[in-house]
Amino acid sequence: NYCMDVNNDGWDDLIRFDQPGGICVWYENPKNKDGLWKGRLIMASAGIENPAFVDVDKDGRNDIICSDAAAKQVVWLKSPTGRNDTAWQRFVISHVKDLATDRYTHGLGWGDMNKDGFNDVIIKSGWWQSPVNVKEADWVFHPADLGKDCANMIVFDADEDGDADVISSSTHDYGIWWHEQSPGGDGNPRWHTHEISRLFSQSHGLIVADINDDGHPDLITGKRFRAHNDGDPGAADAAVLYWFEYIPGKTPQWKPHLIDDSSGIGLSFVVKDVNHDGRPDIIISNKKGVFFFEQAKK
């Protein structure tokens, strides 16, 4: 689920994804009137388990990156720009049918991989380089080994060596990792995966935010409660929620801090200063319930 003023009428609307490969719909805010919110179709077959909600074309409004599971394409959907406009425009990133087009594809990110000033689209097997005109089709793909099935993929120079690294977390197993980029002898980068933590499994959502106001980006994630009901490693473990304090350096570290042990996360969650006290809070909805974690004063 995501929230934005889709039709530019001054009221926030709700964007909802069904099961991977199912419909993506936005619900129009009725402006405090009674009754059900009117649903409008964005896409009939939206794939990838963690679609990205980011500003692709730098117009100040978030767009959607996902796959078209029926057409076997990776696409981005431009959000409406005019007042009372409801049309989403579809642009193809990749026509390669076997590359991140499965409805249950795990792993998607958005960030500048080659330091050219343009954000790229990242999957676990590589990344598509953003053209200057993001509406162009068939972005150039660069193969890379960015680990196992994961959720959100975060582009971040973790070891402060001037290039882009990638952080990811396991969706249905144990593991949170950072993938170190280093120069290769043939001019192509090499990737080496380092484990950050394996305290819990099923970390099916990952967010970066400065939790302790030290100027450094920390990691927030947790265990997705009943991700596959049973069957995943650690399925019966406690539904924990953690933040990992980033300690920068050539060998970066992330110090774990337990927030809660009876909530966990869902496919997505929100880190935001809800009560305007200058400290980020956390909002979660999953199969265990709906939770608001207010960050207390030290």
Where are these regions (language model features)?
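Beta-propeller-forming repeat regions
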Residues: 1-298
